[in-house]
């Protein structure tokens, strides 16, 4: 069977796929239909955070699958409640809403912020400030929140009520707060699709202070950098701020679709019965996977992330053909002299899977990738950058 032809015939043309059909994997290794082995540094775009077919994760998921796969949010289930407890205890947040994706987590964050602001200040205080170069999802509202025009074309009109601030410019943020009737400021502490660009610590702390002074909510989008990838449990923790709302997804359930919106003290009770919902959100199987993930993201695991990050930066900074390395933890962007797409293709030929963010290589390896496999992959990247 020609899988690629079948896909091209029946799947909507929304993806420019690489010419590879992946059929199986184990840990940080995957194999294509011809039996070729690859070291995977993309992990399904930061989803398979313990790699493919992780034994502990599979055991947790299959145990739940044999008990109850779905029942809806009309009933109580243990995995959903236990996962919410874990998230709150590990972050200091108060309540959780579960959806299925990062876009859904951000939609909930936006709804919660607007309802809080309307309840407290009035309906007109609905504007949410996001950052230029940001990415918050592909629904009409999260596209509106995304501060990149390239994603807006063909889908106008977008949801109203968003304005965009210059990253790392507190004066511009203060100006927008003064000029608009605002509910919240929403940011990724590391802009992923925007080129793996971490915000300055002084800016994030300054933004949090501006929110406090102006009675605005601070929303941190942790969809990609969250769940241990930064070397902390969540990326905002590296900046020493406490958001009012946190959105996360991708690696949360280790490979299953799950999004979460964490609500802090100010907004913990803003959503009441009927104000929001999800058919699949909090699915028991997905929650079982996420419980396994969170229970394993201990200090030793996070120190391992930091060590792997330091190794990659040490090896690639100053390497031939490498202009610079950006990012945090195991979410790294590599600026190269050669075209990034050409390097990605060359790496793939040599058995290493990497992806792009704007004009950079984007590295998103499993948090527990064996050091020998990581070293081999980085050697290939260096060779392809230099060649």
Annotate each language-model stretch with its function.
Residues 1-387:
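Conserved N-terminal phosphate-binding loop of PLP-dependent enzymes in the Aspartate aminotransferase
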């Amino acid at each position: 069977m020609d899988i690629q032809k079948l896909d091209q015939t029946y799947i909507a043309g929304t993806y420019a796929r690489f010419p590879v059909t992946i059929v199986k994997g184990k840990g940080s290794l995957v194999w294509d239909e011809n039996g070729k082995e690859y070291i995977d540094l993309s992990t399904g775009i930061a989803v398979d955070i313990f790699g493919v077919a992780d034994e502990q994760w599979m055991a947790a998921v299959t145990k739940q699958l044999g008990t109850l796969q779905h029942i809806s949010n009309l009933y109580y289930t243990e995995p959903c409640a236990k996962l919410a407890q874990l998230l709150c205890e590990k972050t200091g947040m108060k309540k959780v809403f579960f959806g299925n994706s990062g876009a859904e987590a951000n939609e909930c964050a936006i709804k919660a912020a607007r309802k809080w602001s309307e309840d407290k200040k009035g309906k007109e205080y609905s504007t949410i400030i996001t950052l230029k170069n940001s990415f918050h999802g592909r629904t009409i509202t999260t596209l509106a929140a995304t501060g990149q025009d390239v994603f807006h074309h063909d889908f106008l009109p977008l949801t109203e009520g968003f304005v965009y601030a210059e990253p790392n410019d507190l004066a511009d943020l203060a100006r927008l707060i003064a000029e608009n009737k605002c509910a919240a400021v929403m940011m990724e502490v590391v802009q992923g699709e925007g080129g793996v660009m971490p915000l300055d610590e002084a800016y994030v702390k300054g933004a949090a202070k501006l929110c406090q002074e102006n009675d605005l909510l601070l929303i941190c989008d942790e969809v990609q950098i969250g769940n241990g990838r930064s070397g902390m449990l969540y990326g905002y923790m590296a900046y020493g701020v406490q958001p009012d709302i946190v959105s996360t997804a991708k690696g949360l359930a280790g490979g299953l679709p799950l999004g979460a919106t964490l609500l802090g003290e100010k907004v913990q009770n803003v959503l009441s019965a009927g104000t929001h919902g999800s058919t699949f959100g909090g699915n028991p199987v997905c929650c079982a996977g996420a419980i396994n993930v969170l229970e394993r993201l201990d200090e030793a695991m996070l120190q391992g992330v930091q060590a792997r990050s330091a190794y990659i930066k040490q090896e690639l900074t100053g390497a031939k053909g490498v202009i610079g390395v950006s990012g945090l933890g195991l979410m790294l962007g590599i600026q190269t002299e050669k075209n990034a797409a050409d390097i990605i293709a060359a790496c793939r030929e040599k058995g290493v899977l990497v992806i792009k963010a704007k004009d950079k290589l984007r590295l998103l390896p499993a948090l527990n990738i064996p050091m020998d496999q990581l070293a081999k992959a980085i050697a290939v990247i260096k060779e392809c950058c230099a060649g």
